[in-house]
Amino acid sequence: MNRYYSVIGSVVFKKKKKDSDVSVLGFLPSSDAARECKAILDIVDSAFPNGMSEGVGEDCKLQEMFHKALELLPKLWVQEGLIDEAVNSYRRALVKPWNLDAKRLASMQKDLAIALLFAGVEVDLSPRFKIWCSTPPKNNMEEAILLLFVLMWKIQQGEIEWDSEVMDHLTFALTVVGEFESLADNVEQILPGVKTRAERWYFLALCYSAAGQNETALNLLRKVSGSSEAEHEPHIPSLLLGAKLCSQDPCKSREGISFARRAIDSTMNQNKHLLSQARKFLGVCYGNAAKISVSDSERNSYQTQSLNSLTQAAMLCKEDAETVFSLGLEYATQRNLTPAFDNALRYSEMTSGSTAKGWKLLALIVSAEQRFSDAEAIVDLALDETGQIDQLQFLKLKAVLQIARQHPNQAMETYRILLAMIQAQRQSGMDHEVLSDTKLEVEAWLDLARIYIDQDSWPDAQVCIDKAKSIDIYLPQSWHTTGALFEAQERYKEALVAFSFSLSIDPDYVPSIVSTAELLMKMASSQAFPIARSLLMNALRIEPTCHDAWFSLGKLSKMEGSAQQAADFFQAAHELKLSAPVQSFV
């Protein structure tokens, strides 16, 4: 045993003398030193098969040398590039009780977690380690997360001191596996004083927003900017995150404007990048506010401020592709197609055509210019450049463009391919993708139904509608298409019931509002004209660029004998139709 003691003594001496260089330990190469350390561990392990009992005193020389060997062996294997040996050495040190003090044990647990996370290899858990686990971890990532959970628990219990690296590694691991709520739980358990309240709330808001709980995240961000934090400096990241989350929901656009304005006031003359981001979110929120505005003057004001803010953001940070995209989208929404196309093209160049939304915006802008053939060519390019999941939405867009080009048979074939791909994904067990593609599947069946309605093939149309309803019966689109089928069959009362059912699901569904008004104009006497006009005005309040609503309003005015007003409405409908994309920009 004296030989092994001298070896480990040499290792410890060299480690203390030059900690940053472990390539040479004592008079032995690291590989030889590792083998000597392993020999010591084997001897002690055979002597204590169930671990070292607490009866061995802390001053025992064997225990201290053994602990040094436990610590150094995995580091020596890492130096040799033998990651699997290093991981198994860590596991060997941790799987049995060896009387390691709390600090040393925690250090080895953290080192093993780091090795499992960042080594780049999957080191299987050998059977000799599994017998010590009631439920062994499934993979290295799960094992690392469990170790980090243990370390966080020890920190909370006061067994070891706060270590920011543990939280950093746990954040990385849980983010990779998408367990954001679990990450939030661990952040909430951090002891007071480690982070400020603003930092804690911001971190939690990030977790909940990543988990899809935007309302919970916003509630936390409201605390950061609330009266309780008024005496502190504004927390700019929280203001920016609040503006970003609000920009994703038109109903929260005004709150987003408030977040963004406060961020701008706080970053003025400080950080050009943060100021650019704040102005970008401000512009997007202004654009969203315009969509839900009731008055024309307010809508026009918001649209102007949206373009101004986005233009300023683009000038501040010219390399920010997302700002360019937002500017192009806002121009497109306002039907200003030339600058919309320029910005969409610039965005595609900046991202090297790697994003689906860039291709989609470009194709829709070209379709709004009534260049359907060119738009379809862009979609074909997108199908070659994007992944399988994004290809589904482009197949749908391709079919819609083929319908616009009066090629219904080609569109039907494209829809057949789309539905087959969705079915293949479902059978392959890609649950997340199948869930996200349910909407596409319903839309495909309903578009097919409309093709059959136009061809007076009503039984086939009914089959397609039934398919859509079997997926989700509570969709306004399904009942609207049902109404369109009844209307084509001149079953007007049944059509009116179907449109009414659609509006009972979504009172703001514009196609059903317009169709209901059209039916009232067909079915009823002049006494129903005020109701029809009210419906059409409501449709235009919701969607001012709906050319169908303007056209129906023109027909109604003509029926009422207002020729000049009808002409104005027809002119508006014509101009809007000439700049209408085949489907909504957003």
Where are these regions (language model features)?
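Conserved structural position within tetratricopeptide repeats
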Residues: 42, 95, 153, 192, ...
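Short coil/linker segments at helix-helix boundaries
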Residues: 5-32, 46-59, 92-99, 115-150, ...
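Short coil turns that delineate tetratricopeptide repeat
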Residues: 45, 64, 98, 156, ...
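Residue-level detector of the short coil/turn that links helix A to helix B
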Residues: 28, 81, 139, 178, ...
